[in-house]
Amino acid sequence: MDRISNLPNEIICHIVSFLSAKEAAFASVLSKRWQNLFTIVQKLEFDDSVKNQGSLMDFVNGVLALPVTTRISKFSLRFDSFLKRKLETGLVIGPHVVNRCLCNVLKRGVLDLKLEIYGEDGYLLPSEVFTCKTIVDLKLTSCIFAESYVIDVIPENAFLPGLESLFLKSIWFSDLRGCAFQTLLSACPVLKTLTIYDVQWEKWKWSRTVSSATLERLIIQRTEFTYFNGSDFKSITFDTPSLTYLKYIDFVPEEYPVVNLDSIVEAKLHLILTGNQDYPVRYLGREDDPITSNPTNLIKGLRNVEILHLSTATAQMLCFFPRETLPEFVNLHHLTIGPTYYECFNWRLLPILLKKTPNLKTLMIKGPLHLYYRDFNDDEEEEEPEYYCECSSGCNCLLSCHMEVLEISHYRGTTKELEKLKHFLGKLSCLEHVKLGVWASSDKEKLSITTDLLMLPRASVNCKIQINFS
């Protein structure tokens, strides 16, 4: 008997996990003992972007050659383009070859299925993917600039009873007879996490509804903001009563008819208004650029949130709607605004937010307290318009605020920033900890900034200032 056969079963199974499908198939016929150990293959993966990976056909044949009793826990396939493969190798490897392999894998109790199909030549998933009873984690990835992954039909018997996590990247849904997207969600009775990356709603044909009674985490992230055509971007409904986490990066549609986010705990928002629904608003309020987006219902639907992250664009957006738009966030204890590297935070919003957050404990500003920008045609730094960076001297709500932690990530020690910080420290009587990320070019500047900060009067005797120089 060889040395490997003397190893414990656990170690042999670990070795097996590093074999290709073809090697696993060959190894399974070495002996009855090895064949029994091959009843479960932990992971099979093919990535044609990796050199010396071997051919896709060999991989497929290896999968098909596995004993019928072999189970596969995790299956991953990354394939660039059927057309490209034909041009490079002369082999005709069509979608039917990949789908034959997939259908075989789906019969082997697969738990984790990851498919990355890139290219411009189109690809349709086999319907068996949507009736697999064992999948727990499903990831489907395509290319944002091509219709290479379109789901236009979900079978009537679609049912994924074990699916807990669904990841969709650059996937389009197009069903002229109904809504393939909602049909898919309805087929997932225990779905907990949904990620929609590289989303382009305006290219979908769907009911404009995200509905799931079990969903707990939802990530919607648009990555392409340049070629936006919002002519058919009218509304989005969120009916997710169990949702606790929301990350939402996108343009704002004309309306949110229904928003059910009663269980929300944490939300991260980067939302951009549009004018005439065809391009981002850059000069809000102009008569020739009317605002057609309306986030009112969405913001009101977040009233139970405990941790809220607002991008600068989102915070600025809220300034263009009546104060009544903001509900009272009675559960909110942590508020983050920013980053503010390229956009300025409209400070007029802060008093409004503080009045609406009676139980706020932590305020984090990812950026400076006062913004300067550089005109690329000039070497001088200039201040932003005063209405953006007006000081908080009139912010009487600070006197009744129970904030305990204030964090500023890009403090520079300028006169305007020092003045603004003075108002915070002089009025926040419950403040315990101030964290400042400070940029300084010399030891002399560090000493000057530190001295100025330590000299500031504080309403709270327990307030400590932590300075982190970079």
UniProtKB/Swiss-Prot annotation:
SUPFAM superfamilies: F-box domain, RNI-like. The keyword Repeat applies. It comes from the Eukaryota. SMART domains: FBD. LRR repeats lie at residues 114-142, 143-170, 173-198, 225-250, 287-312, 342-367. Residues 1-53 form the F-box domain. Signal peptide: none annotated. Keywords: Leucine-rich repeat, Repeat. This is Putative F-box/LRR-repeat protein At3g58920. It comes from Arabidopsis thaliana (Mouse-ear cress).
